[in-house]
């Protein structure tokens, strides 16, 4: 988890939608400590009792038009109170004109002013998601994260079980590698966990007998992705002939990542099993269940119906005593 996000990084990573209107010289050392974006409302009326100065202050059409109705002295007073040492920056949406009083107050307090052509709601959503992802608490997981047909699948299992080799086979079949060996996971929202590779391991994979390979250079940019939502965990286990493995799919297991329960499938590994194909089918079957079709439940319903029909036939065939 990062304690703060540099304002310079926020601007660089969102340069297609953000521009520095004023205060380039103040950007280098500014940091953002919270993910929430604030739209000052009551503050424009002079009420500052609960003003969250540490947030990015976003002014849209409503705020700018209301401020324009205020007298010059009141506007100056309000913007001076909003421009505190804790304020990372002001952001003006829709490429609206920056009030002169805000420009002066920001200059006096060494606060940069940013501007965007995007709508207020859209830019708030984009920056909030960006900040949440970078300020979120991260958990390191030993495993391999791949994306199969748009679904994030985390491969786990004991060292040497073949996670990396399996992931390499999946990449050769057209799927994407996110992270090998170590996955950094964080909770995006209440029900969503996102995984990514540490910067130093991005696009790299360790294959026993070969060493380190660069997946993007070998297979192209379409074979990798920076991050993805973890929707399914597939745990690879060494085949045990004495174990009683689930053959019908009635068992529904979960594991907990970042306090979020994630569905888990245990797949036994042994020589001769095409693990890549099995994992592909497991991912597609999971998606089918999400869409409302459960082959196991359908089989169970059909079997129950068949047993019921045979029971009725047997009852009808029983001899009657006169």
UniProtKB/Swiss-Prot annotation:
Which keywords annotate this record?
ATP-binding, Carbohydrate metabolism, Kinase, Magnesium, Metal-binding, Multifunctional enzyme, Nucleotide-binding, Serine/threonine-protein kinase, Transferase
Task: List the residue ranges of the region (Important for the catalytic mechanism of both phosphorylation and dephosphorylation).
Answer: 205-214
**Cofactor(s) the protein requires to work:** Mg(2+)
For the region Important for the catalytic mechanism of dephosphorylation, what residue ranges are annotated? Answer: 268-273
Q: Which Gene3D superfamilies match?
A: HprK N-terminal domain-like (3.40.1390.20), P-loop containing nucleotide triphosphate hydrolases (3.40.50.300)
Pfam family of this protein, just one? Hpr_kinase_N
Claim: Nucleotide-binding is one of the keywords in the record: yes
> Catalytic site residues?
142, 163, 181 (proton acceptor), 247
Question: EC number(s) of the enzyme?
Answer: 2.7.11.-, 2.7.4.-
Class of enzymatic activity (EC top level): transferase
Can you tell me which residues bind ATP? 157-164
Q: Give me the reactions it catalyses.
A: [HPr protein]-L-serine + ATP = [HPr protein]-O-phospho-L-serine + ADP + H(+); [HPr protein]-O-phospho-L-serine + phosphate + H(+) = [HPr protein]-L-serine + diphosphate
* GO biological process per UniProt: regulation of carbohydrate metabolic process
Q: Which domain of life is it from?
A: Bacteria
Q: What else is known?
A: Both phosphorylation and phosphorolysis are carried out by the same active site and suggest a common mechanism for both reactions.
* Protein function: Catalyzes the ATP- as well as the pyrophosphate-dependent phosphorylation of a specific serine residue in HPr, a phosphocarrier protein of the phosphoenolpyruvate-dependent sugar phosphotransferase system (PTS). HprK/P also catalyzes the pyrophosphate-producing, inorganic phosphate-dependent dephosphorylation (phosphorolysis) of seryl-phosphorylated HPr (P-Ser-HPr).
State the domain notes. Answer: The Walker A ATP-binding motif also binds Pi and PPi.
Protein family membership: Belongs to the HPrK/P family.
Task: Share what the entry says about its subunit structure, partners included.
Answer: Homohexamer.
What is the protein name given in its UniProt record?
HPr kinase/phosphorylase
Q: Which organism is it from?
A: Lactobacillus helveticus (strain DPC 4571)
């Amino acid at each position: 988890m990062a304690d703060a996000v540099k304002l310079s990084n926020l601007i660089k990573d969102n340069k297609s939608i953000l521009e520095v209107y004023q205060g380039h010289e103040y950007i280098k050392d500014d940091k953002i400590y919270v993910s929430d974006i604030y739209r000052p409302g009551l503050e424009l009326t002079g009420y500052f009792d609960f003003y969250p100065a540490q947030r990015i202050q976003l002014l849209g059409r409503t705020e700018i038009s209301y401020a324009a109705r205020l007298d010059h002295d009141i506007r100056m007073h309000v913007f001076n109170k909003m421009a505190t040492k804790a304020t990372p920056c002001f952001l003006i949406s829709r490429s609206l004109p920056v009030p002169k009083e805000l420009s002066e107050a920001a200059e006096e307090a060494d606060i940069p002013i940013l501007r965007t052509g995007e709508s207020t709601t859209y830019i708030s959503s984009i920056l909030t998601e960006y900040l949440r992802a970078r300020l979120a608490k991260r958990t390191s997981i030993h495993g391999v994260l791949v994306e199969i047909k748009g679904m994030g699948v985390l491969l786990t299992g004991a060292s040497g079980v073949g996670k990396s080799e399996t992931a390499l086979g999946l990449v050769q079949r057209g799927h994407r590698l996110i992270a090998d060996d170590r996955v950094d996971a964080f909770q995006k929202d209440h029900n969503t966990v996102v995984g990514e590779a540490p910067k130093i391991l991005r696009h790299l994979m360790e294959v026993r007998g070969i060493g380190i390979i660069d997946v993007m250079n070998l297979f192209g940019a379409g074979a990798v992705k920076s991050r993805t939502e973890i929707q399914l965990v597939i745990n690879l286990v060494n085949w045990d002939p004495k174990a009683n493995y689930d053959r019908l799919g009635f068992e529904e297991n979960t594991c907990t990542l970042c306090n979020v329960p994630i569905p888990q499938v245990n797949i036994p590994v042994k020589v001769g099993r095409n693990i890549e194909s099995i994992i592909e089918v497991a991912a597609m079957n999971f998606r089918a269940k999400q869409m409302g079709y459960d082959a196991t439940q359908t089989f169970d319903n059909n079997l129950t119906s068949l047993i019921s029909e045979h029971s009725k036939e047997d009852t009808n065939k029983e001899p009657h005593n006169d």
